[in-house]
Amino acid sequence: MTKEKPSSTRVAKTQALDDLIMGTNSSSIVSKRSVERLYYPNELHFFRYFVNKFQRRAPLINRGYWLRLRAIDVIVRQFITTPEPGRRKVVINLGAGSDVLPWQSYHRYGDSCGDTLFIDVDYPDLMRKKRAIVLGTPQLSELLGEDPYVSEKETDHLLLRSDKYCQVGCDLRELETLRKCLESFLPLFECSVLFVAEVSVTYMDTISADALIQWASYIGQAEFCLLEQILPHGPDHPFASTMLKHFNKLNTSLKSVHQYPTVNSQRSRFEKRGWNSVDVWDLWEAWNSEVFLNSSERAALDDVEPFDEWEEFILFARHYIVLHATSYHRGGKGAGQQMLASPPGKHVKANMVATKSLGAPKRRFGSPLVASSPEGGQYLVHTLGMGINARLDSCDIYSIQESSTSLEMAPVGPSARICHTTTDLGQGDLLLVGGRASPSKAFSDCWVLKKSSNSWEKTFDLPVPLFRHSTVNLPGSSLALVLGGKTGPSEISSDYFIFHPVRGWLKCAVSGVSPNSTFGAFAIASTSLGSKNGHFEGLLAGGIDGEGKINNQAYFWTVDVTTHEPIIHFESVQNYDQHSWALSVFGAQTANIESLSFVCGGVGQDPSSQGQSMACLTVKGKSLAVHLVDLGEKAGQLPFMVGSATVSSGSQLVIVGGGATCFSMGTFWDTGVYKIDLEGVVSEMIPGRTIHNKPVVVGYQNSPKLTQPTTDGVYPGPQSNAFITAIPKIKLQSKSDFEKLVQNRKPVIIEGLDLGGCVEKWNSEYVIQSVGETKEVVVHECQTSTGKMDFNSKNFRYVTESFSSFMTKAARGEALYLRALSEEKPTEAPANLAEDFPGLADDFRLPEELGSVKDRMFSSVLRISGRANMWLHYDVMANVYTQIQGSKRMVLFPPTDVSHLAFAPGASSSSLDIFSALDTHQLASTNPHEAFLNPGDLLFIPAMWFHTASPVTDLSVAVNVFFRDLESGYSTGRDVYGNRDLAAYEKGRQDISRITKSFDRLPSEIRQFYLRRLADELLHE
C-alpha cells in the first residue's frame, strides 16, 4: 500500500509555519550580536557577519542573552575539553540558524578543540543562506580549510563539509533522513556526540521533539544540551502569559512547554528517553552556580553597562532551563534544583477581592503613601514611577473610603523618578527619599508631604544619592531609618542613616556583625511594647549583594538614638534556613497591620517566589515568626507584586499598579486593584485583638502632575493669603482707547459694547436651532465629581455628542466643555465662528472700537460649558473673551508670577487648582486678578497672562477672539490653537538642551554647580 501523498494545502501550511520559525532566528541573532559587541570587546566577533546593521539592545535583553550564551558555552567547553581517548568529538547544533558556535569555540579554546567536528543542522533554505555567507566571508571560511566539499544539487542534505565544520539542511522531524546524512560521512557510533538545542526543538510538535530526544540518546556516546522555556507557575503567571502570547502572535507557538512546564518534568522527560544522567538548572540557578560563572564574572557585567532590571531578569531566568544529559551514567546526584528552601510550614488564609482597572494610567516602580483630606477622607497616593514610555512626574490618587471628597494636592514637588521610598513619619509628615532617573543618575533630594496641607516641601538632602534602599519609620517617633541601596550603577551603600526632621541626616555607627551590603532589601521595624524611649528594633533581609546574588542572610537590628551619633547593632537570624523562602527576596514591598508585617511580592531565591507570594512576619526582640499568606492558587487572578504599591487600611491591604518587561516579549501591566482582607489573620496571630474597620471602597480620582520648584528652599513661602486685585471695568470711546489697552498689557473688563444680537438671542433653544440638533461635536467630559479639569493629568475624555444632547446636559450643569474647532480642517486650520457656525455668525460682531482685533484676528472660538472649571494656562496671543450667556469667574496672573504657578518647563498649562489655593498660603507670592463676567461683558486678556475660569451659572456661552498683538516673532508652521510659544523661546529651549548635554560627562555636583551659574547669568541679563 503506497503512502498517501500530503495535500498541497497541508504542505503550504507546513512551509509557512517553517518560514515563521526560521524568522525567529533573525531577532535572536541581532540580540546576540549586541551582546558580542558590548560584552566581548577583546574577542573576534562572528555574529557581525550575519547581521546587516548593529542594533544595541536594552540592558535586560543583553544580560539575558549573555546568560543564554554562557550556559551553552560552558557545557560545550566541558564537552570539548574532557579527554575521550579513541573517540572523535562531534558537536551537532540542532536548529542552528545563524549561530556561530563553531567559530567561537575554536577561537576561545583553540588547541583544546583538537579535531572536534561541528555540524550545523537546520531547514535547508536557512542553511543555504548561511552557507553563502560562510563561503563569502574569509573570516568564516578560514575554518573550512583548503578544500571543503560544497554540494551542487538542490536535493542534497549535506550542503557543506570540511574537517572542522559541516552544514546539513534537514527538517529535524525527518530523523531517518538526518541519520543517513550524518552516517554518510561520519561513523556516529564511534564518536562522542554532543547535541545542542537552544530554543529550537520547542517549536516542534511535542511528539516529534520527544522522538528526536530519544533518537539522539542512541547515537554513539551521546550528550544533550537543551535550552528552552518552561512555565514554573503555569501558563497564567504574568510572565508566562506574556511570553506565550508573544510567540502565538508570531504564529510560532511554543509546543512542548505545556507538557514539560517545570524543571522536574524536563528531567523526567529525558530520563524516560534513554538518558541516564540528567542535570537541569533554570537560568537563575545557573546564574548562581559556580558551574557557569563565578562572583567576579557576575560583578564585572555591571562595568559593561548600567543595569537595574533585576526583577525582570530573574523572572526571565526562572522561565528558561538549561539541561545537560548523558546517555551514560556519570555518577553523583543530578545538578540543578537540589538545595531548595524549606517549604513554609505555617499558613494563614486571606480573603481577596480583585477589581479590574479603574481607569488609572499604567504605573510601576512608584511608591505609595496614605494621605488625608481636611474632611477626614483617606487616599492612596501612588507617587511617580515608570509609565508606558517614560518615568512619570505624576501621582495616581485613589480614595479608599466610600463617599470621599476629592483630595487636593499642591502641584509643586519632586521630579520624575523610580526606585524611591515613601514613609509615614507618624504624627509628623510623609517622607520621600532618593530614587533615580537612569541607573547612572541617582538622586539625593528628599521631600516631605505635609499632612496638614498635602503640599510638598523639600527637606535635607541625603549625604549620598540612593535608590533601591529601604526606609522604615522608627515607631512612636518622627524619625526614619534608611538602610542600604545603590549609589550608582555598581556601587552599593554600606551605610545606615537616621532622618531627623530638625538635625537632618545622621550616619549610624555600626556594631555587631557586619551585614552584606545590599540593595532592594526589605526592612521591618518592630512595634513590640518592650521598646524603650530612643531604642528601636527590627529586621533586615533580602536584597541583592555585590556578587549579583540574592542575599542569603537576615539580621535583627537595634538602633539607639539617645547618643549624639546613632548606633545600629546587627545580629544574625539563627533559624534563617527555616524561613529563607520568605526572607531571600528582592524588591518586595512591606505593609504593617498592628504588630504584623506583610512582605508582599518581589522575586526570591526560592522558585516559588515570582511576584505573587506574600508572607506574614512578626518580629519581637530576637524572635521571628513567619507564615505564608494564602491568596489562592490561580496565578491569573493574583496580584502581580513586582513594582506594585501596597498600603494598609484597618485590617486590609490595598494593592495597585505593578508590572514587568518580559524580556523581549512585551510588557505585562497589572491594572487591577486588589483588596486583601486580613481580619482573620490578625485574629489568629494576635489573640483577643479585634480591629474595627471602616469599609474600604477604592475609587480612582485623578493623576495630577508634579512640577519642580524654580527656586531652592522650603515651600510654601510667606504665611499669608494672596491679595486679590479686582480687574477694572471701563467703557471705550474710540479705537485708540483699545490700542492703548493692548500696549499697556493689563487685563480690563469692557462694558457697553454692541456685540450684535447674540446677548439677547442665544438661549439654549435658539442656539440648538441655529446650529442644528443632530450636528455632532467633540466635547470634554470631566471624569471627576468636582468638575475641575486638568490638561496635564487628562482627567477628562473626549466624547462625541449631538449638539442637542450636549446643550441639554450643559444647561443642567453637567461637567462638559466645548471648545469649537475648525469645521472643515480641525487639525490644520484655526477655528472661525463665521465658517464653523454660520447659523450663529450673523448674531455676533466685534464693534468698531475693536477694529484692530478684526484686522489682526487669528481665530474666533465658540466656547460652551456646564459646570466645568478650565485649567490654568496662558495664551501666546492676546485675546478678547466675550461672555454671551451665563456668568463666569475668571482669575488671572501676570507673567511675572510664572515661577510660583507650577508650570513645568515648556508647558503652557498647570495642574494648580487656583480656586482652592486662593484660600490658602500657597499663592502668597502671586498677584491674582479677578473678574466676574456677566452677559455682554468683554474681558481683554493680554498675551502670557495666566488665567483659569469657573462657572457661576449652570450654562456658559462665550466667544473668544484671538489676535496677533506683536508685529513679528511668532512661530512658523501649523498652529491650530494659537498657543505655540514664540520662536525665540522655542529656539532657546533647543539651545539649553544642547548646553545641558555638554555637561553630561561631569560628576553630578560639578554639573549642577555650572548649570546653576549659567541660570544665574540668564536671570541677570
From Swiss-Prot:
Positions binding S-adenosyl-L-methionine in this chain are: 68, 122, 171-172, 198
- UniProt keyword annotations, A-Z: Methyltransferase, S-adenosyl-L-methionine, Transferase, tRNA processing
GO annotation, biological process: tRNA methylation; wybutosine biosynthetic process
Task: Kindly state which reaction or reactions the protein catalyses.
Answer: 7-[(3S)-3-amino-3-carboxypropyl]wyosine(37) in tRNA(Phe) + S-adenosyl-L-methionine = 7-[(3S)-(3-amino-3-methoxycarbonyl)propyl]wyosine(37) in tRNA(Phe) + S-adenosyl-L-homocysteine; 7-[(3S)-(3-amino-3-methoxycarbonyl)propyl]wyosine(37) in tRNA(Phe) + S-adenosyl-L-methionine + CO2 = wybutosine(37) in tRNA(Phe) + S-adenosyl-L-homocysteine + 2 H(+)
Pathways involved = tRNA modification; wybutosine-tRNA(Phe) biosynthesis
The answer to whether keyword Transferase applies is yes
What is this enzyme's EC? 2.1.1.290, 2.3.1.231
Q: Into which EC class is this enzyme placed? A: transferase
A Gene Ontology molecular function term for this protein is: tRNA methyltransferase activity
Domain JmjC as annotated: residue spans: 826-980
Question: Which protein family is named in the record?
Answer: Belongs to the methyltransferase superfamily. LCMT family.
Q: What does this protein do?
A: Probable S-adenosyl-L-methionine-dependent methyltransferase that acts as a component of the wybutosine biosynthesis pathway. Wybutosine is a hyper modified guanosine with a tricyclic base found at the 3'-position adjacent to the anticodon of eukaryotic phenylalanine tRNA. May methylate the carboxyl group of leucine residues to form alpha-leucine ester residues.
- What name does UniProt use for this protein? tRNA wybutosine-synthesizing protein 4
Q: What species is given as this protein's source?
A: Gibberella zeae (strain ATCC MYA-4620 / CBS 123657 / FGSC 9075 / NRRL 31084 / PH-1) (Wheat head blight fungus)
Which gene underlies this protein? Answer: PPM2
